[in-house]
Amino acid sequence: VSRGLGDVYKRQMSDTDAKKLVKNVTDQLKTVSPISGYNSYNFDYLDAYQKMGMRERHVISPYLEKQDYAAGFVAPDEDVSIMINEEDHIRIQAFAAGMNMQKAYTLADKMDDVIGDVLDYSYDQKFGYLTTLPSNAGTGMRASYMLHLPALAGNDKISGLIPEVGRFGLVLKAMEGDNNRALGDIYQLCLLYTSPSPRDTERSR
C-alpha cells in the first residue's frame, strides 16, 4: 500500500526534507499501538550489509535499500512492514503464507487505518490516494504473489511467459537477479496497476 503525505511528492524532496520526514513520521508512529511493539530501524544507524540482510528477508524493498534517508517499523514476526521514504512517503507491506491474499489484505488494511488516523494522507475525491507514480494512484494498493518456479526457469520458459501474463495486466519479474533465471527461481507475480480494494468491489455489486 502506497501513501503520500502533503503536497510534495517523494521524488521532489530535498535531503533536508527527507530527513525531516523520517523524524516527524517516526516520532508520530512510534507510540501508536500496535506499532509501538514493532521493531524500528533508521538508516542513519545501519550499514550496507544490515540493509542488504533486511532486503533479502523482504522486510524492506530494493528501492528503500538504495535511499540515504529512510526508516521504518517491522512486526515481530515480519508479516507487516512500514517503510518511510520509499517510492512514496509511506509504504505498507503485508505478507501471508500460501495463497491467502485476503489475510495479507486485512493486515495491510488495518495498518493503513492505524497510520491514517495519525497522518494526513494525500487524497483527492476524483483520483483517490495521490502517489508519485500515476499507476499507483487510486487505492494505492498492489497485490502480488511470490512464486517458486524451478521447472519453468530450468526449461527457459520464463521469458515467453512474461509477455503472456502482461496481456492480463500482470507483471512477472525476478525477486533477485535476471528475469530469465532468478536467484533461487523465485519470482513475483503482481498487478501492473493498483488493485480495487475488497471494500470497493463490494460497493460496486
Task: Annotate each PLM feature.
Residues 129-145:
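Conserved phosphate/anionic-ligand binding catalytic regions in large, soluble enzymes, centered on
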Residues 107-131:
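Short, hydrophobic/aliphatic alpha-helical segments
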Residues 115, 143-173:
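Signal/transit-peptide handling
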Residues 35-41, 120-129, 171-179:
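Flexible, glycine/charged-enriched surface loops at secondary-structure junctions
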Residues 17-82, 98, 102-110, 155, ...:
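N-terminal low-complexity, intrinsically disordered segments
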Residues 161-195:
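A structural-propensity feature for long, helix-poor, extended segments
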Residues 3, 7, 81-95:
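Residues forming anionic-ligand binding surfaces in small-molecule and nucleic-acid pockets
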Residues 1-9, 193-204:
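Single conserved hydrophobic/aromatic residue that forms the stacking wall/gate
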